[in-house]
Amino acid sequence: MASGFCSLALTVTTSLFSSHAITRRVLPILRWRSSSMSLSPLRHSRALSAATTVPISSSFTWDDVIETGRAEYNSSDLTGFFEKINRCNRGSEKLGEFIPFVIEEQIVGYIHKRFTEYLREFHDIFTFSQNGSCPDRVDGYVTLNLMLQKPEDRTRAVADVIKILGDKGIIPGIRNELYPVKPSFNAPVFFSLERAAAPYFGIKGYGVHMNGYVERDGQKLLWIGKRSLSKSTYPGMLDHLVAGGLPHGISCGGNLVKECEEEAGISRAIADRAIAVGAVSYLDIDQYCFKRDVLFCYDLELPEDFVPKNQDGEVESFKLIPVAQVASVIKKTSFFKANCSLVIIDFLFRHGFIRPESSGYLDLYQRLRNRDCS
């Protein structure tokens, strides 16, 4: 196509998420030499230090949460909310360290240039194209071998690579859960990728987050969960009543019902009352990881006598807390898992806890969706 890679160069540097097709090139089919994956100790150590994110843990208690929330909520001061949004949108100055990951002429992700060193070893799976017409702007792109035409073939081939990289500790925390790889939510799925590998390939990730609330004596209260200390990610931190990533092959509504049962013991009859209220999005770059997430937000008003009961062992306990107190905790602490704060801030807008009279109101609202929400 005429737009090709030269026009893409401007896209990568100034407007990362514009949809530009990339001219298809005939790429050589080379043999995959898996034995060449043996890395020198120095190189392997350096890769791990750059690629592994240390899980966040917290030793605070519910008493700490309640004590923090007791301070009077000041709806006019939005500073703490901006800080939480910034926490989920780090690393924009590092965009130049990544190159596009392309399938069928569509950008589906972004891969760190140094991480591509591992992928170059798998010659039958990944191919690399340089942009000869404007090399000063773009350092080429990564794609899959043209022999891999079917989604299921791509899924199997890439899964073999991820297993090797996972066994070597280069991609930690393998979950055996597949995420769809596609340029946008309603686009066709090009293949499926192990969830733990998603940020290393910079693919779009989707999730469902539900605000479970109760109205009592004219006051709104939110059910908040505290993650189990055995969780591999964000152990012991505060979380939504129900939240989860969106795997391949299940709808948002279907996944929400499943998560409601597993995480809080909410029956389908009650879960079906949840209302889809929008989405938030963010982009977080941390070393080799490039997270482009869209979270679909739901509200569910629960009966006053409802008490959640975790079924899958991933939640330590729950607490019903007035919304104004939850807002204060988000403002003043880092007790919440970072992306949960965004969904609750959106809830605060919709339920009148953040008002137009507050300085920065529109800026804050816009920044909840200031990345590619598609």
UniProtKB/Swiss-Prot annotation:
<keyword id="KW-0479">Metal-binding</keyword>
<comment type="similarity">
    <text>Belongs to the Nudix hydrolase family.</text>
</comment>
<dbReference type="InterPro" id="IPR031804">
    <property type="entry name" value="DUF4743"/>
</dbReference>
<dbReference type="Pfam" id="PF15916">
    <property type="entry name" value="DUF4743"/>
</dbReference>
<keyword id="KW-0464">Manganese</keyword>
<keyword id="KW-0934">Plastid</keyword>
<feature type="binding site">
    <location>
        <position position="263"/>
    </location>
    <ligand>
        <name>Mg(2+)</name>
    </ligand>
</feature>
<dbReference type="InterPro" id="IPR000086">
    <property type="entry name" value="NUDIX_hydrolase_dom"/>
</dbReference>
<keyword id="KW-0378">Hydrolase</keyword>
<feature type="domain" description="Nudix hydrolase">
    <location>
        <begin position="205"/>
        <end position="346"/>
    </location>
</feature>
<dbReference type="InterPro" id="IPR015797">
    <property type="entry name" value="NUDIX_hydrolase-like_dom_sf"/>
</dbReference>
<dbReference type="GO" id="GO:0016787">
    <property type="term" value="F:hydrolase activity"/>
</dbReference>
<keyword id="KW-0460">Magnesium</keyword>
<feature type="short sequence motif" description="Nudix box">
    <location>
        <begin position="244"/>
        <end position="265"/>
    </location>
</feature>
<dbReference type="Pfam" id="PF00293">
    <property type="entry name" value="NUDIX"/>
</dbReference>
<protein>
    <recommendedName>
        <fullName>Nudix hydrolase 20, chloroplastic</fullName>
        <ecNumber>3.6.1.-</ecNumber>
    </recommendedName>
</protein>
<feature type="transit peptide" description="Chloroplast">
    <location>
        <begin position="1"/>
        <end position="49"/>
    </location>
</feature>
<keyword id="KW-0809">Transit peptide</keyword>
<keyword id="KW-0150">Chloroplast</keyword>
<feature type="binding site">
    <location>
        <position position="259"/>
    </location>
    <ligand>
        <name>Mg(2+)</name>
    </ligand>
</feature>
<dbReference type="GO" id="GO:0046872">
    <property type="term" value="F:metal ion binding"/>
</dbReference>
<dbReference type="GO" id="GO:0009507">
    <property type="term" value="C:chloroplast"/>
</dbReference>
<comment type="function">
    <text>Probably mediates the hydrolysis of some nucleoside diphosphate derivatives.</text>
</comment>
